[in-house]
Amino acid sequence: MRSQIYRSATKAARSFLSSSKNASSRFLPEGRTVAATAAVSLRVKAPYLASFGGANASGTWMSTALAIPAAAYLLQDQEACAAEFERTFIAIKPDGVQRGLISEIVARFERKGFKLVAIKVVIPSKDFAQKHYHDLSERPFFNGLCDFLSSGPVVAMVWEGEGVIKYGRKLIGATDPQKSEPGTIRGDLAVVVGRNIIHGSDGPETAKDEIKLWFKPEELVNYTHNAEKWIYGDN
């Protein structure tokens, strides 16, 4: 019975949260306003319903009165937490794919605590590669760079986490592997700049543009990772 209560509470909480987005409170943050509304509503109903069902009905409705605001607050808290996290675009280039380095690279981001929210394998056209490297169109190596990116399969990914854009770049290392520190992906796994195995967004705006170029909105998965409380929790 209690599991049914909490499932119903979560469903009701989602409904409250959805409707509250169109009418925010002047006095309380959105989640707390919704929770308070749910609690007040059920406290009014509980005595009335209890008169028909006795103590068990009263206990059930009071449990629900506690469950709905709690669920609403937790859902709101999850949404707020997710909104704080950055997202970055990471691509394993054809050389990294052909050398069998996919799992090695993915593992490094996972071990850091970042969350994978999108991944696919594609062979981009040269036109697509030119769109990706549009900011380098005036550089002498532009044509060769686009030829290489479109020469084979690319593993395109979106990673999420606190500081993922800046730290992702540190994790990747300098563009020239010869200048990359040991411990970085390029420092450990690449030798020359023309085969530096991986690409990562260099800033928030670039990340947004690259994610939009490579992925449709529905390909990005929003979810709460079970390890997040062990990664981001406060003591």
Swiss-Prot record:
GO terms for cellular component: chloroplast thylakoid lumen. Its main location: plastid. Signal peptide: none annotated. Its cofactor is Mg(2+). It catalyses: a 2'-deoxyribonucleoside 5'-diphosphate + ATP = a 2'-deoxyribonucleoside 5'-triphosphate + ADP; a ribonucleoside 5'-diphosphate + ATP = a ribonucleoside 5'-triphosphate + ADP. It is found in: Plastid, Chloroplast thylakoid lumen. It comes from Spinacia oleracea. GO terms for molecular function: ATP binding; metal ion binding; nucleoside diphosphate kinase activity. GO terms for biological process: CTP biosynthetic process; GTP biosynthetic process; UTP biosynthetic process. Homohexamer. The active site is at 199 (pros-phosphohistidine intermediate). It comes from the Eukaryota. Major role in the synthesis of nucleoside triphosphates other than ATP. The ATP gamma phosphate is transferred to the NDP beta phosphate via a ping-pong mechanism, using a phosphorylated active-site intermediate. Shows the highest specificity towards GDP. ATP binds at residues 93, 141, 169, 175, 186, 196. Belongs to the NDK family. Optimum pH is 6.0. This is Nucleoside diphosphate kinase 4, chloroplastic. Its EC number is 2.7.4.6. Keywords: ATP-binding, Chloroplast, Kinase, Magnesium, Metal-binding, Nucleotide metabolism, Nucleotide-binding, Phosphoprotein, Plastid, Thylakoid, Transferase, Transit peptide. InterPro entries: NDK-like_dom (IPR034907), NDK-like_dom_sf (IPR036850), Nucleoside_diP_kinase (IPR001564), Nucleoside_diP_kinase_AS (IPR023005). The keyword Ubl conjugation does not apply.
